[in-house]
């Protein structure tokens, strides 16, 4: 590490907020390319985080870089509304072609939480209803409105008193004994019956369905632990919304743009929402997001009811267009399904060898590896942190999720190869071995 880097690292704790300076692992890097980061230490690291599900086509893809350079030669800033430009109009057209159902009208912003804020405002405005129902464990952002529907961790809401116009029902929980058969397998019909009961009680005792504008959820629980519900469970949510004339919002900030093996998780599960929030993988690292609805719904949201200065930036829109091209041209959705299935097979083999691995949760290349205490079978977030450190020493970068940080989050670029999966999981296995040695676990564990 250079003297300048060392100095800057020492200063980071005082110059950057703790959420930036003290997150895990804060790896100092100088370059990114494909599925790799290049550290200031000269080490090449295999990246299984994709910038937290952002660089789905790989880091610094040449086509994205070229699109950014060409766009910057013409326009660097809008704002849309004051002027119009080709990239935002073309992007809206191309997104409409890949989104499910009739989701074809857009309000562009910069980040996932902004897209959620827009979705909540739109739903309340057009329904003229004040309340929103969200699901326990879901994460939708850290601004005031999105925080009000986020319950993945209580610390995110501490002292902030998010507005009280929200209610929660439990998200699908695959370990809930009420929905399991004698072999411990999920009975989907029981899960749907339980969901129906939760909503019935909510509408009976807490809030009238006639006052609920929207139900919002992540089709795959992301920050809350990569919980994957059955398609029938999501279909039941859709049915309940239809019955009560409530709008359904999907937060596809993390699941979108091929992560689940389809363009969006809505297509993976065959359930189409009324409103969708998209971000992260849309522009390969440039700030861009969108609140999406059908034309009829969006046109009820008049001029001045929402706004943006930077949303739909022309350079970001150009990067998004190039991102869509790469996803199509390189068949990355197919690769996500194929390589994702291969990764799951390899992880299941690891699970057979290491009792500290609880469940493997995967759809496409959205993969969670639960770590538990082999003796108590309880989630072990402390173990995850140490295992991630050891894996980084081996040369692979993972992230974490779950209420207790108990899940290793594996979200490589959709361009990842089977060989790179092998490399990364070999490194993870070596980290597991070292962790067992450090903690003096018996060989059988």
Curated annotation (Swiss-Prot):
GO MF term list: identical protein binding; pyridoxal phosphate binding; transaminase activity
Cross-referenced InterPro entries: Aminotrans_3, Aminotrans_3_PPA_site, Class-III_PLP-dep_AT, PyrdxlP-dep_Trfase, PyrdxlP-dep_Trfase_major, PyrdxlP-dep_Trfase_small
Keyword field: Aminotransferase, Pyridoxal phosphate, Transferase
Cofactor: pyridoxal 5'-phosphate
SUPFAM superfamilies: PLP-dependent transferases (SSF53383)
Residues the record lists as N6-(pyridoxal phosphate)lysine modifications: 280
Enzyme nomenclature, EC number: 2.6.-.-
Annotated CDD domains: OAT_like
Top-rank taxon, per record: Bacteria
Pfam families xrefs: Aminotran_3
Classification via NCBIfam families: PRK08117.1 (NF005993)
UniProt similarity note: Belongs to the class-III pyridoxal-phosphate-dependent aminotransferase family.
Protein's name according to its UniProt entry: Uncharacterized aminotransferase BpOF4_10225
